[in-house]
């Protein structure tokens, strides 16, 4: 039986690097992987998955209205897919996560999703919430806070390094916009003096 996997972490934990390594492992054994990433995350260019250490691979892009199962079936019809790998899975909709579960259940293709668990305010992303609810296997990828503790949260900052406490849930950025922290230091950073 194929499974739906969700590997989550805070920013800068190496999620994309791990995805690209897993894809390489499949390909090295003569297997075909299908890579997907969110259209709105174009930090390394649209239609690419890239890591901070310089690894890159082409990927199909999805948006909120992409029919994931139809895209995967079409790709599978052209060349049998041995594993589907989704980067930036936090940007999936609830409906799209259910579709990915059907790919695993009906097509018997493993689906590996990688993404953030929570946003800069500590709220679950919709895609992550559904993955946490229905994935067969859930894995935490660890990174560290500046204090050495496990980082589980992220803060958003402006160009001057000032922590932003309110705003849209989705704003694309990398190391210049987001910092991974342990919960204690996240709470301290988010405290506006009233806490």
What are the residue ranges of the model-derived segments?
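Conserved ATPase-coupling elements of RecA-like P-loop NTPase cores
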Residues: 89-100, 120-125
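Catalytic-core regions built around general acid/base machinery
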Residues: 22, 99-107, 130-134
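Conserved P-loop
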Residues: 1-75, 119-130, 140-143, 163-165, ...
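Walker B catalytic acidic pair
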Residues: 87-89, 115-116
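Conserved AAA+ ATPase core "coupling" helix
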Residues: 136, 142-163
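Sensor-1/coupling segment of RecA-like P-loop NTPase cores
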Residues: 104-126
